[in-house]
């Protein structure tokens, strides 16, 4: 595990953040993130789907529109989300969405109680700095469960 460091030049110019599958853009965590970084433009995006391919399409479209709206190159945006939203963002980046960084909050490493059904097949294609935040009580993946899979991510990773 290495720490993701940004220079002024490489620092993300905006953040597209998505909630879990059953939540919307007004989820308390997304609001707290937006309010916690007032200097960074933030787009809180409701996905309104549990289909990863549909979510990926929505993330890409919203990211391109947001970059245009704030006047930055789309590859200067960071993407992330909570649970399903983070998973969808990670798949989008793995499939080629240019991004400055990835933020995965309570990433669903596996379905609760199904430790053998890992959602890490796309990790090697993630080549951007990635922050993973997980708690000891998270039924979708605890920090020690992530340890064996972080090295699969091609970009720098930080676990918190």
Predicted regions mapped to residue ranges:
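Catalytic histidine neighborhood in serine/cysteine hydrolases
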Residues: 41-43, 152-160
């Amino acid at each position: 595990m290495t720490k993701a460091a940004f220079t002024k030049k490489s620092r993300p110019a905006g953040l597209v953040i998505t909630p879990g599958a059953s939540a919307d853009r007004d989820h308390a965590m997304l609001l707290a993130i937006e309010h916690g970084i007032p200097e960074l433009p933030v787009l809180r995006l409701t996905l309104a789907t549990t289909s990863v391919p549909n979510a990926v399409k929505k993330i890409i479209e919203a990211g391109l529109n947001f970059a245009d709206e704030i006047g930055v190159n789309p590859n200067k945006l960071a993407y992330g989300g909570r649970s399903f939203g983070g998973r969808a963002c990670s798949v989008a980046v793995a499939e080629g969405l240019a991004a400055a960084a990835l933020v995965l909050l309570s990433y669903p490493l596996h379905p609760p109680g199904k430790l053998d059904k890992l959602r890490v097949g796309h990790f090697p294609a993630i080549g951007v700095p990635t922050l993973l935040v997980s708690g000891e009580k998270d039924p979708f993946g605890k920090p020690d469960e992530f340890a064996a899979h972080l090295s699969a991510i091609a970009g720098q990773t930080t676990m918190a």
